[in-house]
From Swiss-Prot:
<dbReference type="GO" id="GO:0016829">
    <property type="term" value="F:lyase activity"/>
</dbReference>
<feature type="active site" description="Cysteine radical intermediate">
    <location>
        <position position="468"/>
    </location>
</feature>
<keyword id="KW-0670">Pyruvate</keyword>
<feature type="active site" description="Proton acceptor">
    <location>
        <position position="470"/>
    </location>
</feature>
<feature type="binding site">
    <location>
        <position position="193"/>
    </location>
    <ligand>
        <name>2-hydroxyethane-1-sulfonate</name>
    </ligand>
</feature>
<dbReference type="InterPro" id="IPR001150">
    <property type="entry name" value="Gly_radical"/>
</dbReference>
<dbReference type="GO" id="GO:0046306">
    <property type="term" value="P:alkanesulfonate catabolic process"/>
</dbReference>
<dbReference type="GO" id="GO:0005829">
    <property type="term" value="C:cytosol"/>
</dbReference>
<comment type="function">
    <text>Involved in an anaerobic respiration pathway that converts the sulfonate isethionate (2-hydroxyethanesulfonate) to ammonia, acetate and sulfide. Catalyzes the radical-mediated C-S bond cleavage of isethionate (2-hydroxyethanesulfonate) to form sulfite and acetaldehyde.</text>
</comment>
<keyword id="KW-0556">Organic radical</keyword>
<comment type="pathway">
    <text>Organosulfur degradation; alkanesulfonate degradation.</text>
</comment>
<dbReference type="InterPro" id="IPR051215">
    <property type="entry name" value="GRE"/>
</dbReference>
<feature type="binding site">
    <location>
        <position position="189"/>
    </location>
    <ligand>
        <name>2-hydroxyethane-1-sulfonate</name>
    </ligand>
</feature>
<dbReference type="Pfam" id="PF01228">
    <property type="entry name" value="Gly_radical"/>
</dbReference>
<comment type="similarity">
    <text>Belongs to the glycyl radical enzyme (GRE) family.</text>
</comment>
<feature type="domain" description="PFL">
    <location>
        <begin position="32"/>
        <end position="701"/>
    </location>
</feature>
<dbReference type="Pfam" id="PF02901">
    <property type="entry name" value="PFL-like"/>
</dbReference>
Amino acid sequence: MSMTTCECRSPQEQRLYDKIEGREDRFRKTHPRVFRLLERFEGQKPRIDIERALYFTQSMQETEGQPLVLRWAKALMHIARNMTVYVQEDQLLLGRAGCDGRYGILYPELDGDFLDIAVRDLPTRKTSPATITPEDARRVVEEIAPYWKGKTYHEALNAALPAEVHKLTYDDPEGLISRFIVNETSSFRSSIQWVHDYEKILKRGFNSIKKEAREKLAALDPLSAKDDREKRPFLEAVMIVCDAIVLWAKRHAVLAREMAEKESDPVRKAELLRMAENAEHVPGEPARDFWEACQSQWFTQMFSRIEQKTGTTISNGRMDQYFQPYYKQDREAGKITEAQAMELLECMWVGMAEFIDMYISPTGGAFNEGYAHWEAVTVGGQTPDGRDASNDLTYLILKSKREFPLHYPDLAARIHSRAPERYLWDVAETIKYGSGFPKLINDEEIVPLYVSKGATFEEALDYAVSGCTEARMPNRDTYTSGGAYINFAAAVEMVLRNGRMKKYGDQKLGVETGDPRSFTTWDQFWNAYVEQHLLFLKTAFTQQYIINKLRAEHFAQPMGSAMHDLCMKHCIDLHQEQIPEGINLGYFEYMGLGTVVDSLAAVKKLVFEEKKLSMDKLIAAIDADFEGYEDVRALLRSAPCYGNNDEYADAIGRDIDRISVEYGNKYSMSDLGIHNDVRYVPFTSHVPFGKVVSATPNGRTDGFPLSDGSSASHGADVNGPTAVLLSNCTTKNMGLRDRAARMLNIKFTPKCVEGEQGTEKLVSFIRTFCDLKLWHVQFNVVNKGTLVAAQKDPQKYRNLIVRIAGYSAYFVDLSPDLQNDLIARTEHDVM
């Protein structure tokens, strides 16, 4: 069905259709500034800006032998002094990490051994390409890359992995290509997703933090070796980085004043002078009004992205909470209108859209298609005393997401049992718009779980969403290492192939559990799967053990640490060691839950219980990728499936979850010193993970994507969306602590949620999600015909936004494989 013949369209589809037909966007008149800003980079391929990498490298060359945290701070000061600053036409906020338009920056300390490959391949690679000028490419190869050869974190990790771990991790000796079996993720980002305490900066400013560091420095014990060798460098680094961000801001103020002197338009002249005044005051000092609060937060966010690759996944935190006092004050004083406040927020949204989180390694690129971004803004939730926290700014941000024609920022709405009807209605109306916002995160699951891990109720109630589905507690979270992604569908294949995989030939990768044709009982098959499963978990935990040992030698985060209460209290950088009083929330990802559950259910039911299929014939059909075995495939696809509230399948899923969580309970704290929780959050990696797995016993064909997150297999959820929620609930072991996020994707047709009745149904569905204590759910509201049409004519559908993993992206920026994956997801037309 083509878009032009759809009986019912989402508002996004209608907006897109209006543009195709040449009609003006109805929001252009109310958002003229933002539309002008957007049109300057619409459809633009990102450009790599090398200044951050160049100045960081220059400084690190000069400071060898000094404590790493001090070197990092000095590098940030060198960047702050020398990096080009910009004042964009029409913008009301100052601060960029790179050039005009869409841009990305490089972090050579992380994966600089990929730089030669990156500058060669980035412009032409199929997923998330970027441009780089010939001169910048030359400087990368000649001035930046040589220094980092042999010094990068990725090289150190690759060398440290034992052979039995390496063979399940990488497909080459240098560790450039992943095997997509047990995949480490720490080498293409400096840290997992993070949330800063922005409220602290708005209320205190960096000059106050510098003063605190100076006082702590003066109070150190002059006879203590630890104070001298560890605390002193940390505090000196904090003082330097506080000066660096203030200097960087003031350089923007100078440029804004220079531009104001030349500006002939009196309105723009006044804006530039006010922007200069803002940058002279914040983020060094406390914000005095809403505009300064936005500017202070934006400087902080952008300098965090300059600091390290954590910054590319820096969450915006609970923006409706920490901005609300400034918004309320200015509204009551008549200093700002709702439209002016929205314009400031949307200037920030534009800045987020221009910064592209570039993954230069082949594996990182495969994991994060469509220029993945996780700068989540969290709205709603609860106050420290447990009351509903929604306010005027909550509704303004939701309204902006319905009117702002871009997939930035990512938006997360916290849901709890006492959420007011007005809030849920606005959330539902925003979901119905069709661009995938907001994703929903459930207080009823997260708050008690975090209390069980050691948080106070007040701390747990103040969590903010970060990354795809993560929940972070500012000033209590202290763990930064990325976790492993584990392809458990490969474990099923290894049972069928005696520890081997078709993709990798005769190499023994897993446990030799025997020829499955010799198995006479389901228990034998199940136990063989458990052996492979446990090997994968041990491999992941071994990776994490080594990662934890290496990170302190390669990373420091003086600015992020300066904003963290516990880091300042104990004078410890976030990357250096376990921080006293912190809660270390790590994770490993279960890839392919639906694929594995359905495969095991089919084997149990059809081979061992009903004996409708022999193991020999099953393996022959899988080896043939079901060609000539269409009857076998049809039989397999008729077996019980996860996502249908079918206890037969769901019980297997619950057992799988229990094995993973119990392993974590046993070894996380003893071996790693962290809560290494099981999660089901694939980003876009279920596509490349599926490419290495041959056909599976659920009827999935060779190379087809695995099921994503905690969602059902493609087309397997035939009993409606509520059954999907119920399966998600019943496969979770509620009584076990070391568990975390479950990403759940659901696709509705616009007709399903049409009108007020559709909104009422969606609100009811959200309340069911909340009552079942599920972690996360997100929606696509789009017609399949629109997606198919966009594949055929990508230029015409350039602005079509879809929900992918924990973020939204332009559909046409996705690979054909990921586009097809989205199209193949079950489309629910009733609720």
